[in-house]
Each structure stands twice: as structure tokens, then as C-alpha cells.
Amino acid sequence: MGEQLNGLKRTHMCGELTVEDVDKYVVVMGWVQRRRDHGGLVFIDLRDRTGIVQVVFSNEVSSEAFEKVQSVRSEYVLAIEGKVVKRSPENVNPKISTGEIEIYANTLKILSKSETPPFPIEDRSNVSEAVRLKYRYLDLRRPSMQKNLMTRFKITKVVRDFLNKNGFIEIETPLLIKSTPEGARDYLVPSRIYPGKFYALPQSPQIFKQLLMISGFDKYYQIAKCLRDEDLRADRQPEFTQIDIEMSFVEVEDVLKINEKMIAEIFKETLGIDVPIPFKRLSYQESMERFGTDKPDLRFGMELKDLSDIVAQSEFNVFKTALKNNGSVRGINVKGAASMPRRQLDELVEFAKTYGAKGLLWIQVFEKEVKSPATKFLSEEEMKKILERLEAEAGDLLLIVADKDEIVFDTLAHLRLELGKRFNLIDENKYEFVWIVDFPLLEYDEGEKRYVAKHHPFTAPKDEDIELLEKEPLKVRAKAYDIVLNGTEIGGGSIRIHDTELQKRMFKVLGFSEEKAWERFGFLMEAFKYGAPPHGGIAYGLDRLAMIITGSDTIRDVIAFPKTQNAVCLMTDAPSEVSEEQLKELHIKVDL
């Protein structure tokens, strides 16, 4: 059994001691990073979340502490009292913040012993993610993981401080709510008291934050847990955290402006970076046409160019078929890549096919000639205009896709990113923000044979497009906006519908009968009857934002206890079976 503190109080954190503390008697507590025995002296590197300090045990200073330290091993938890001493110049360790000093120990308490951990507690440790997640409490001791979670904490602190001083109120919304499935599946919670009835866990606080605006709270925020029973996808978590914000009496520009200031403050406080505001703005249409995606990475060029008008009369069958089927022909210019070997070109063709393209046309531009499988199918004039449109020079490689717009955009967007990485065109130290605005309000779902909301059913249409809602739904633009950073969407929001009649029209276009709409959202429709202010807001994915700011490879590295890609907690073995007794109480039978 470990020793008790018996009134011993920690005076300093390990990583915070400096030469200013020389000759002070201090008490430090933490874990043993490593132990080195040099005969008459034993050195312990003691670690806590602030860093490491070297502690020296000498028989001459304290024979009791020296004798006790002989049994100490890695990851033992110790309390040490001793005197801070300046190291001699040749013993200074510039790799650690406390490298100019060490502690000569007078007292040692072994608070807790440790078995040999399954992997070394250090950043260089080469261990599988599965083992790290199984022993997450050990993984979290590693300095990089401690730093990640401290940065995450700093982000939420900056958010709270900023919003508090700007008149926002932090309000919690319920976790047990009514199931209103639209989009991802709800996690359901059976009610024991009302057999056969279920609560849902919230996919977002969306409806409640709108109700708070109707309640008169004006400016709301919350660091909210959200849960979605989604199909398994890489780097998605069944539970995630949102920075959730809503404001009354605002238009799009008001929401964008205050959020730009908040983001700038987050980056200033966490990374020491001055982010220029206002951010760039791109309409959804422009973003798709220039980058093939509504999540553009603006750190490099290689923009898409539409070649459809140039090849409109072409006899080349590939182009002809695409244009006949209301598709398009678009291309990108990979500067200086004309000499790419045939094997790599073939790999790019296969890469394009994974995104639904039937093929990929390449054109190599050299000083005196142009090489391409399509040379014999294109007229001299067509080739000349293609080279001009793509601003081709000797040494460039042109890549062209002809198909339906969605396939052309998706393929070229992924090719652009892939080649940007291959040719080191992306500056990893750059942060390029952009607002994507004027999204389509609706999309048509071929599977369900109905219109679905691009964002959610409460998004307001642009005023000038309202009359198109029933006549030409796909032409209606939304008062919606996404914030994209380096090709990753970190947040999104909209101005909401605050009028009962317009909300009814929206539900009708989405294929909801009046009864179905009332059954799911009647409480919101009822609230609209009693004076709803114009309102709008935004939600950020905190996990994704923290991942970008910390430079992590996966969101699992910025969440304390994440699930795997298979939505499993390897540490606690959740989800797990429950007893027959528990199921009986809930009136549930498992039918597998």
C-alpha cells in the first residue's frame, strides 16, 4: 500500500521551476519518467502535466530517502521535498524547461507503485493505436497528448471569454429529447416509466437554441455534446462536441462578423497567429466551379477551368457524350509536371476512376510538341484553345475529366488535393479561411424520390428566392454559410425561418404532410405563433478545430476518451450486452 500525504502540500509544478527558485525548499509530486543509478547518486526524472524536473538522491543529503529510492521504478507516483540547486554549466539540459536546475531530495514518499506499463510513456513510443486506446489513461500521460488536451481547453476558454464579454449567455439544453429524425439516425433511449416510448439523444441543440431565441435570451452559446448514430466512416465519432451559438435580430453579415473576431482571438491565444479579417467569401457556385468542392483549400492554386464551350462541337466521343447528357468538360493545370512517367499517369487515371470518372485525359505540354491520347480526336483549334484556357506553358501537365457535373467536380477536387500534396504545393504553416455562402437550400434525393434540406429544414431561403420555393426548388439559395479552413469545414450555420407559414411551406416541399410536420415539430410551430424574432447562428466542430490547431492527424488525438473508427471504446468495452433483468425492466426483447 502506498504512503499517505499526511499534510504534505505540493508547492510547485515540476515544469515550472526555474533558476529564480534556487535555494528554495520545494515539494513536487508526479510520476517517474525514468530512474538512473550512478552508484553514490540516484537521478529521478519526475513528470507532471507541466513538464519534467530532475531530482537527485544522495546518501549524504538524506540516507532515508536514498535507501527508499532504490525500489522506485518507472511510473511510480512520488511526493518529494527538497532544495532547488543550480546545475553546473556542463550539466545543463537545454531540452527541458527546468534544465538549469535540479532538486536535491530530503524527503521521499512513494504514494503509489506501478507495474511495467504496456508501452513507454513518451512521444517517440512506437505503439499501435489499438493499444493506446485500450490503455488510454496511460496514453494521456504522454506529453503530446497532455499538450493536445490543454490546447483544447484553451480553445474553449477563449470561446467562453470572448462570448461572455460580447453579451452571450451560456445555457444548457436537454440531453433526453424527442426523436425527430432528419438526416443521421438518432441514438434512442428507452423509457422505463413509459413502456414502448423512447427519448432520443440530441444530434445538435438546434431546435432548443431556436426556442431560446423565441424565449427572449437574444444571445446564446453552449459547448454541447452531440450524438449521431451514423454509418462507420473514417475520423467520425458517434459523440462529438459543438461550439453552439445563436443570436436574435441578426442577418448573415452580423453572424459572420462576430465569428471572424472570435476565430481570430482563438488563433491569437492558442498559436500566437494574427489571422487577417474579414475572411474571403465564395458563393457555393463559385467554389464548386473553381475548386470542385464546397470545402476548398485555398493554400494553393491549380483551379478548375470549364472547357465545355471550347469542345461543344468536338467529334471526340468522350466529350460529346458528356455534353449530350448535360455534363461538362473541365480541367486543371499541374505546373511543371509534363515529364511525369507513363506509369504515374496510369495511376492518376485509376485514381480518377475511384471517384466515378470513366477515365482521365492527360495532355503533356513540351517546348516543341503536345503529347496526349486525344491529339488525334481534337482539332488544332480546339487543342490551342484548351491550352490557352488552362494557361499552359512548356513543362505543364493538363488533366481533363468529362462527365456529369458532380463526378467532374468530385474527381478534379480530389486530384487537385492529391497533386497538391505530391508536389509540395501546400504550405502547412498557412491558415486560409473562407466563408462559403449562398448554398442551395435543397437537394433532390434519388433514393427517397423527394427534396431534402442541404443543411436542415429550419434554414431560411434568401428573400429574393422565396417565390421559387414551390416552382423551382433547386434554384432556391439559402441564407446559409460554412466556414472552411485549409480545406476542412470547421463550422456551419444559417439564418433560420422564424415565420410559421414559411416553415409550413418548407416542410411541404420536403414532402412532410401537415400531420407529420406537426407530429415531429409541432412544439416549434406552436412557439412561432407567439412572436419569434429573426435569428441565426452557427455551430463549430470543436474536435476538428482542435485537431487543426494542434496539428494532429486524427480527431481521436484531441478527445480524451474517443471511440475507434468502429464506434467501440476499447478501454471500457462499450457497447456491451446488458442483463436480462435490465431489458425486462425496459420491456425490450433482443431479436438478432
From Swiss-Prot:
Residues reported to bind L-aspartate: 182, 228, 455, 496
EC assignment: 6.1.1.23
Reactions catalysed, as given in the entry: tRNA(Asx) + L-aspartate + ATP = L-aspartyl-tRNA(Asx) + AMP + diphosphate
Localisation: Cytoplasm
GO MF annotation: an example: aspartate-tRNA ligase activity
Main location: cytoplasm
Top EC class, one word: ligase
CDD domains: AspRS_core, EcAspRS_like_N
Keywords: Aminoacyl-tRNA synthetase, ATP-binding, Cytoplasm, Ligase, Nucleotide-binding, Protein biosynthesis
GO biological process, one term: aspartyl-tRNA aminoacylation
Annotated spans, Aspartate: 206-209
Site (Important for tRNA non-discrimination): 38
Record keyword NAD present: no
UniProt key word Methyltransferase: no
InterPro entries: Aa-tRNA-synt_II, aa-tRNA-synth_II, aa-tRNA-synth_II/BPL/LPL, Asp-tRNA-ligase_1, Asp-tRNA-ligase_1_N, Asp/Asn-tRNA-synth_IIb, AspRS_core, GAD-like_sf
Gene Ontology CC terms: cytoplasm
Ligand binding (ATP): 228-230, 237, 489, 541-544
Stated family: Belongs to the class-II aminoacyl-tRNA synthetase family. Type 1 subfamily.
HAMAP family: Asp_tRNA_synth_type1 (MF_00044)
Protein name: Aspartate--tRNA(Asp/Asn) ligase
